[in-house]
């Protein structure tokens, strides 16, 4: 809530980043479901054109480029222990979300048209992930876990709306009507890349765990560098390529039977 003199404003918002629930189905079978962010877009850049040769007639030109939105992943999966220590799993995934990109040119001279253009994208996709995991005891109280996952590449579907609005303050009757068109993404035009992940963990009984994971996705054939709304505009150069990440982590629970552990 914000208030200053006779101005008042209030805003309520709610958001969450990760939510997962798991439950046993049978002695060797368990299921889980959850929701997590997949991608986020959030940027805003402003520049001014001050070249005297240009602004002598147009006035200072302000260019603002902005992008916002994101995609969310809803998933449902199951894991099954085939034999002692060896487990396999499968996960269904649904991606959905909206992305918005705007490009505004504002003229200070009211006899020139200001232009606002951009893209509104409503996107979704369905895919699946498969995994395998093996756990073996190394010594008394120490075990190792090795695992791998693979997510299938899939076509990104939805609609991409391109719009352009021109405005002028001094000659209202000469302002062109807003222009826009909507393109339905055909199958295979844009793809979400497949993903390969491998990892290894060491577990010290029920007290501590240390792990390292490697994930690789090849986006070079995703088509995003060719389709309007995804591809770069103007002289900027964009080319989708391979994304790789290495992640490591460590956790410790000194006393798993402590009542404070169950109250977390």
Predicted regions and their residues:
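Surface-exposed strand-loop-strand hairpins of Gram-negative outer-membrane beta-barrel proteins
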Residues: 1-13
